[in-house]
């Protein structure tokens, strides 16, 4: 019996031997390693749950109807992370982008070379459309679409300057029946000046008759009266025949400078006349002759 106690005492007192139970030391060691690994791993942030907001769906009078809408938690960086997880060496962009960009680049270089060879044509901007209040009745408002006119004061000044031309004066005095140059046709001349895109000081006698001839093409069915424009411009000699062909060519160029916008609304004509309602030109009304 004493021998067994001596062996036990020897085992417990031996250097380097842990007197604690072996199972406890092994379990504590594993628990320690697991806690260290858990501390090394970064904590994963949980994505915020999608929130719900209230948005205005319909506004009727003084009542407002709200609609519940879910806000998506997807952000741009999520798309960026998704693209980065693709197979290495794979371009997330479309495969034909470089080829299309190359062809687009070549086309752009060719267009720049063609622009250097040909002079640039300055076109007049197209008129914009706005909505204006036409009638207000109680809490209801009636809107009407209205075209914004591009006629500026300098276009009226160019028109008034050309009225002092002696040839134009004789032509207007000759047209007593107002078959070629009534107030609406003359107002269209001002509208064409604003659409052609030329500076006001460049408009000359030929531009006045080109615009007036084109206005007759748009509004008048009788072709004979406007042929008298050639008589006041070139006379009655045979040498005027090539000049008439040149006039028709210039008329087409003038039409193209307006981008083919030769139609003028009645509202715009009245607006042009309202700029200076006391002008003597607006007294050329066919209704007063009958």
From Swiss-Prot:
Region (Disordered): 16-50
Pfam families: Spy1 (PF11357)
Annotated InterPro entries: Speedy
Single GO molecular function: protein kinase binding
UniProt feature, compositional bias: Acidic residues: 36-50
PANTHER family: WBSCR19-LIKE PROTEIN
Family affiliation: Belongs to the Speedy/Ringo family.
The name this protein goes by in its record: Putative speedy protein-like protein 3
Organism: Homo sapiens
Higher taxonomy: Eukaryota, Metazoa, Chordata, Craniata, Vertebrata
């Amino acid at each position: 019996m004493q021998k067994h106690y001596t062996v036990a005492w020897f085992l417990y007192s031996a250097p380097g031997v842990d007197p604690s139970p072996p199972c406890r030391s092994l379990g504590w060691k594993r628990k320690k390693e697991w806690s260290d690994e858990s501390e090394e791993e970064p904590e994963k942030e949980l994505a915020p749950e999608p929130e719900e907001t209230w948005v205005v769906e319909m506004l009727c009078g003084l009542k407002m109807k709200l609609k519940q809408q879910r806000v998506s938690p997807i952000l741009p960086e999520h798309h960026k992370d998704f693209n980065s997880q693709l197979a290495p060496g794979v371009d997330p962009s479309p495969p034909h982008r470089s080829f299309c960009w190359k062809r687009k680049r070549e086309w752009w270089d060719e267009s720049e070379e063609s622009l250097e060879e040909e002079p640039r044509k300055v076109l007049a901007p197209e008129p914009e459309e706005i909505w204006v209040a036409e009638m207000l009745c109680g809490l209801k408002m009636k809107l009407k679409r209205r075209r914004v006119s591009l006629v500026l004061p300098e276009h009226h000044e160019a028109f008034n300057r050309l009225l002092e031309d002696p040839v134009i004066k004789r032509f207007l005095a000759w047209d007593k029946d107002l078959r070629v140059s009534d107030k609406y046709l003359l107002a269209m001349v001002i509208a064409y000046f604003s659409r052609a895109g030329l500076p006001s000081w460049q408009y000359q006698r030929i531009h006045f008759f080109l615009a007036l001839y084109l206005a007759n093409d748009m509004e008048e069915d009788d072709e004979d009266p406007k042929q008298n424009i050639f008589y006041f411009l070139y006379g009655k000699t045979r040498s005027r025949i090539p000049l008439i062909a040149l006039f028709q060519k210039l008329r087409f160029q003038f039409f193209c400078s307006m981008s083919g916008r030769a139609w003028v609304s009645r509202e715009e004509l009245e607006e042009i006349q309202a700029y200076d309602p006391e002008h003597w030109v607006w007294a050329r009304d066919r209704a007063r002759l009958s």
